[in-house]
């Protein structure tokens, strides 16, 4: 990965694959980074862009709060920088909100979406703002334990990916986590997402305590023709619970829409 120097910040990004291959853009969840996708297999004949969102990983972490529009604009600028058009955008949780916003704003960039473990609106402003206030006092270490259970399920302590995920979370810049969480708090895409008309696959985890299956299905139902798939035995981050099955779902969707 390498830093992309934008006028106001540096974003850590990685672009792989032939320049003529169909593009896929991967957008990670709150408190994680692009390493989240490391074990997920995708077809080799793709041009895949992944990045660390602002405030995450090796990207710059400006002071909070962040606006969702700014986070969408970051991905838009990266795609323009790399001259990517007609991409399938795969977004998980926060990344799914960004994917929806990008499709609403720049349909020329987005040919299709995979909305994974996400919704048009996640939680309430009151919940997110209270969580931000608490974390600003205590830091991310105390928050991490509850987050592990919500993301990985009740057996989180024995999950082989728990140490890696916990490290990602606690190493996220405090300004970055709070900034992005404030952006989630202020986002409601129900009306604009319902106006989208593009191939969409929505994926839910049966054990997801953050974006339960009914919430994901409700969002899929906003988009005519959207597919919905429930993954059994997985939580909020299917690429950690069952990366092979998760990658196969996404790969099959790409094949169905002729992307690759």
Locations of the language-model features?
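Flexible "cap/lid" loop of the alpha/beta hydrolase fold
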Residues: 97-105, 109-144
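Conserved alpha/beta-hydrolase "acid-adjacent" motif
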Residues: 209-215
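Conserved acidic catalytic loop of the alpha/beta-hydrolase fold
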Residues: 70-87
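Conserved alpha/beta-hydrolase catalytic His-Asp/Glu region
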Residues: 11, 123-126, 138-194
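Conserved HGGG/HGGXW glycine-rich cap/lid loop of the alpha/beta-hydrolase fold
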Residues: 9-61
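Catalytic histidine neighborhood in serine/cysteine hydrolases
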Residues: 217-236
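Short beta-strand/loop motif that positions the catalytic acidic residue
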Residues: 196, 202-204, 208
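Catalytic histidine-centered segment of alpha/beta-hydrolase-like enzymes
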Residues: 234-247
